[in-house]
A protein has these predicted regions:
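Charged docking surfaces used in two-component/phosphorelay signaling
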Residues: 188-360
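N-terminal Rossmann-like NAD(P) cofactor-binding subdomain of oxidoreductases
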Residues: 1-207, 237-238, 310, 316-317, ...
Length: 360
């Protein structure tokens, strides 16, 4: 791509915002020009605003340290400086919806990491390898908003990114009837590090607010279809989920139990995973993993500590496939929750939108 788009990050000081900042450094298509956050941070340099809260393992990029943080609520000012924004704010859902819609109506496309608009009927919730065609709803959304350029597109919840990609090629070939999923989710998913979450040390917390509902409902929108001016959710598979917070820094793991309309052999499942390529790979998007789904033959893999950075944290790792006594099969999955599951997935979605001309 010859053009480089000017990009802003709204919610730049939080953990996901910090991940956006690191991912956008030296991005071939996107140039980070604007950082915005709450009024508390506005008027400070990015280094001052973040202070001791920098949570990335790599140092803060020199290019952003002296950049002035702007007030995210001054929508027209921020929107005028960029071609589109990434949004990763920590606010009540109704306020997030209002803020994202305000940016869209200011003719500034929004690529959101937030959950507030995931079930807005004409807002595409996209994993580029799975349902890239859902971005075709954007003209209908623009009509509702009364915009020419502005729109909202969102990524799905981080918990889904470990198991939905593994189920997707199996859905297409064999028809998934039902699935039971138990997720074991890293503390960075709560925006925490170990020094800021002492209660997780030597502990497992068997509840994450709202996470089980998202884990059961959101896949059905991903597997849905466009009908007129809205997206119709798929009716199956039936998914039941239990979500745990575990003492892991990064990387969400899932135990998956699945039954099929037409039960495949183990070899057919492994072949479906090995051969799967989505639009992100076909378009050769900059952040796309070459091999989306990686299967490990070792009995003790995948592990977050060993495998979360596979393909720069953008791959999904699978292992321990075997037949089950109640379901047809069971297996384990893992993905990096702040890369594939959050900022990295949003950057990949933005690359898809750019490649398809939605920012022009």
């Amino acid at each position: 791509m010859d053009k480089q788009y000017k990009v802003g990050v709204v919610g730049a000081t939080g953990m996901v915002g910090q991940r956006f900042v690191t991912l956008l450094e030296n991005h071939p298509w996107f140039k980070l020009t604007t950082l915005a956050a709450s009024g508390r941070s506005a008027g400070k340099t990015y280094e001052e605003a973040v202070g001791s809260r920098w949570a990335m393992t790599t140092p803060m990029p020199e290019s952003v340290k002296g950049m002035m943080v702007q007030d995210a609520s001054k929508v027209e000012e921020v929107a005028a400086q960029v071609d589109f924004i990434f949004c990763a704010v920590n606010m009540p859902k109704d306020e997030i919806k209002a803020l994202e819609e305000a940016y869209a109506k200011a003719e500034c496309p929004v690529v959101s990491n937030n959950s507030a608009n995931r079930f807005t009927p004409d807002v595409p919730m996209v994993v580029p390898e799975i349902n890239a065609d859902h971005i075709e709803i954007i003209p209908a959304q623009r009509k509702r908003l009364g915009t020419k350029r502005g729109f909202i597109a969102v990524k799905s919840n981080c918990s889904l990114q470990s198991y939905v990609p593994a189920l997707h090629p199996l859905m297409k070939e064999f028809g998934v009837n039902k699935a039971l999923v138990c997720t074991y989710q890293a503390i960075s998913g709560a925006g925490k590090t170990f020094d800021r979450m002492p209660e997780i040390v030597d502990n497992v917390i068997p509840y994450i607010g709202g996470e089980e509902e998202k884990s059961e409902r959101e896949p059905l929108k991903l597997w849905g279809h466009i009908e007129g001016d809205h997206i119709v959710n798929a009716e199956k598979p039936t998914i039941t989920a239990q979500c745990f917070r575990v003492p892991v820094s990064d990387g969400h793991t899932a135990a998956v139990f699945v039954s099929f309309d037409k039960k495949p052999t183990k070899e057919q499942m492994l072949e479906a995973w090995a051969n799967f390529r989505g639009p992100a790979q076909e378009l050769n998007l900059p952040s796309a993993p070459k091999q989306f789904l990686h299967y490990f033959t070792e009995n003790d893999r995948p592990q977050p500590k060993l495998d979360r950075n596979t393909e720069h944290g953008m791959a999904v790792c699978i292992g321990r496939l075997r037949e089950d006594t109640l379901f047809d099969y069971k297996f384990a999955c893992m993905s990096h929750n702040t890369l594939r599951g959050a900022a990295g997935g949003a950057v990949l979605l933005a690359e898809l939108l750019a490649a398809k001309g939605y920012f022009d």
